[in-house]
């Protein structure tokens, strides 16, 4: 079953040039779905379109848009409590002059009415999902944590609202290989053990082949290949996909990616 189903998504600039060219996209429930492609292919544009975060000089159209089986015209109403977003800029998500416990409980209470005790309970649960303990985090400031720890706290700040869908745009791009793999292990655990749905935009082929169940390949604004992981391991692939998998290099990113 798909959590998001969008048909004929097109994104244009003010000159009416199509940057995303009529793609059909399904994000399957309780799976890690991936979108991969070269620099400038438009990967992050798709994520921004789903969340209505497109720059003002770009516009999008589509024939139909469903979320959790219901027709929708805007997803902004779901952002935060039903749809979470993880970016690579985790260090900018917390200020340096407020303890993390206060910031995390404020995130929960912004979306849900509840007592401080209830918020702390939700924060404690979210931190446990990313293998952190409240006693080690709540009384600290962001600058006191390592990059890997802060990334986990950032993920916990999304999980505290218990969203059905998490959109992750290059979530480990700014981490070293070891911390990046640890974070991907955590995201996989969250999907498998807690029933979350993940849509990840990444240029890391190794992560895609190791962690993802369903994959889209984007080239010049068009999806040229799609399928489950077995398709990409055992089937005859598009020459472009073959080249990506052959080299398995981390593809460069630009302004739009």
UniProtKB/Swiss-Prot annotation:
Catalytic activity, as annotated: Ni(2+)(out) + ATP + H2O = Ni(2+)(in) + ADP + phosphate + H(+)
GO cellular component: plasma membrane
Protein's membrane topology: Peripheral membrane protein
Gene Ontology MF term list: ABC-type nickel transporter activity; ATP binding; ATP hydrolysis activity
PROSITE patterns per UniProt: ABC_TRANSPORTER_2
Chief site of localization: membrane
EC number(s) given by UniProt: 7.2.2.11
Domain of life (superkingdom): Bacteria
InterPro entries: AAA+_ATPase, ABC_Ni/Peptide_Import, ABC_transporter-like_ATP-bd, P-loop_NTPase
Localization terms from the record: Cell membrane
Pfam families (alphabetical): ABC_tran
Domain ABC transporter: 4-245
UniProt entry keywords in alphabetical sequence: ATP-binding, Cell membrane, Ion transport, Membrane, Nickel, Nickel transport, Nucleotide-binding, Translocase, Transport
Top enzyme category: translocase
Binding, ATP: 37-44
Family listed: Belongs to the ABC transporter superfamily.
Subunit structure: The complex is composed of two ATP-binding proteins (NikD and NikE), two transmembrane proteins (NikB and NikC) and a solute-binding protein (NikA).
Its job: Part of the ABC transporter complex NikABCDE (Opp2) involved in nickel import. Probably responsible for energy coupling to the transport system.
Annotated protein name in UniProt: Nickel import system ATP-binding protein NikD
Lineage: Bacteria, Bacillati, Bacillota, Bacilli, Bacillales
Gene that specifies this protein: nikD
């Amino acid at each position: 079953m798909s959590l998001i189903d969008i048909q004929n998504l097109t994104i244009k600039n003010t000159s009416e040039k199509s940057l995303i060219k009529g793609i059909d996209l399904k994000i399957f429930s309780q799976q890690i779905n991936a979108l991969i492609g070269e620099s400038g292919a438009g990967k992050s544009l798709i994520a921004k379109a789903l969340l209505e975060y497109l720059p003002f000089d770009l516009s999008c159209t589509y024939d139909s848009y469903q979320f959790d089986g219901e027709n929708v015209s805007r997803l902004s109403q779901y952002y935060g409590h039903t749809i979470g977003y993880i970016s690579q800029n985790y260090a900018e998500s917390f200020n340096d002059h407020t303890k993390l416990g206060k910031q995390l409980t404020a995130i929960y209470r912004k979306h849900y009415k509840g007592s401080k005790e209830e918020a702390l309970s939700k924060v404690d649960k979210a931190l446990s999902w990313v293998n952190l303990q409240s006693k080690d985090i709540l009384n600290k400031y962001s600058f006191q944590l390592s990059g890997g720890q802060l990334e986990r706290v950032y993920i916990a700040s999304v999980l505290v609202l218990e969203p059905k869908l998490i959109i992750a745009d290059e979530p480990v791009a700014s981490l070293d290989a070891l911390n990046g793999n640890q974070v991907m292990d955590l995201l996989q655990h969250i999907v498998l053990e807690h029933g979350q749905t993940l849509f990840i935009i990444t240029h890391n082929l190794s992560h895609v082949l190791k962690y993802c169940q369903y994959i889209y390949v984007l080239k010049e604004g068009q999806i040229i290949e799609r399928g489950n992981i077995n398709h990409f391991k055992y089937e005859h692939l598009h020459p472009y996909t073959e080249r990506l998998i052959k080299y398995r290099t981390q593809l460069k990113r630009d302004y739009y990616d």
